[in-house]
Amino acid sequence: MLILLSCAKTMSDVSKTKTPLTTFPGFRKEAAEVALQMSQFSVEELERLLKVNPKIAVENYRRYQAFHSEGTRELPALLAYTGIVFKRVHPQDFSEEDFCYAQDHLRLTSFCYGVLRPLDMIRPYRLEGDVRLPEPGNRTMFDYWKPILTDRFIADIKKVGGVLCNLASDEMRGLFDWKRVEKEVRVITPEFHVWKNGKLATVVVYTKMSRGEMTRYILKNRIESVEQLKTFAWEGFEFNEQLSDETKYVFTNGKTE
């Protein structure tokens, strides 16, 4: 089973956690080109393109200016992203065996790097999927990456059993030819819902936390089969057979109001 997670907007370049090894990103040449083009934008342009405030725009202007410098700090991708999902994965207490297992069974999307393995060394950046690069052809990041990533992604899934546990946000499907992915491998997309006023609702923060917790559960327990995936339980969330089907695994908090 391969897990797909979305990258986070927040990143760090410092960590005390040691990993058994580090690797180069599979698409580092493309990432360098993406970053080079992003470095041509002014602070004001980045503020508009990334939809951020001036402070964050300045921070990322500096990041892109330093992206190609030898002294720029790097971290393994799983330690570099610091959003809610990654806090719940909590790789800081992973064993060497956990990291090695994750390297084969987890992939992280990235608008700058394409797709990353957990131990791929990356530099801080911020990028959105609808940003258009001048070259080639003024394409969005989705259109840029789709023909590059799809074959490699499908091959990675097939290497570990042909099942994808899709814990990424919906927009990340745009980085791949998703119809091809669904045709060539089995895709299961877990959903997490809570009862609110007698109806099931999606609470973004719970969804993010649950995605991180499920990722941790799969990696720590070496979950390989779809049946084992159904055993995930956290903070009252449990597998709901009635609401689930072959492609959508629904987990609810089990409290009908």
UniProtKB/Swiss-Prot annotation:
Tree of life domain: Bacteria
GO biological process: response to hydroperoxide
Pfam families, A to Z: H2O2_YaaD (PF03883)
GO CC annotations on file: cytosol
Family, per entry: Belongs to the UPF0246 family.
HAMAP family: UPF0246 (MF_00652)
Listed PANTHER family: PEROXIDE STRESS RESISTANCE PROTEIN YAAA, PEROXIDE STRESS RESPONSE PROTEIN YAAA
Protein name: UPF0246 protein BF4021
